[in-house]
Amino acid sequence: MSDAASADLDALRGQADALRARLAAGATDAELAAARALLTALRNARQYDALAQLAEWLSRATPDDAHVRRLYAQALIEQGLLTAAIDVLQPLAARLPAGDPEQAEATGLLGRAFKQVFFDTQDKC
């Protein structure tokens, strides 16, 4: 990884840390929007630990935000925390209407998580 790429990742993680601290202290609407936008950047940069931590705090502030919950679950899956991800995704998929794009994403991630649990299981009988 180049020094520039490493610096970019450090900057992303720094932004996530700063926003997480603001969320813990009670964030403004602008800070909530910035944190929500940063989730996608963290996912795209494959920074799943920072993504999960920021999504945890953002979920506390906006518990009904399906996009945040889905990205949180995706970060959990990427870190191998499959049953935790399933526990986030099942109620999310159940409460969203069938035509909602986040419902389709949540259902797809559920399938991915269950498939990984199956492949991780020693006895497949």
Question: Which residues does each PLM region occupy?
Answer:
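Amphipathic alpha-helical repeat scaffolds of TPR domains
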Residues: M1-D10, G14-D17, G26-T40, T62-E78, ...
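Amphipathic alpha-helical segments of tetratricopeptide repeats
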Residues: E56, R60, Q90-P97
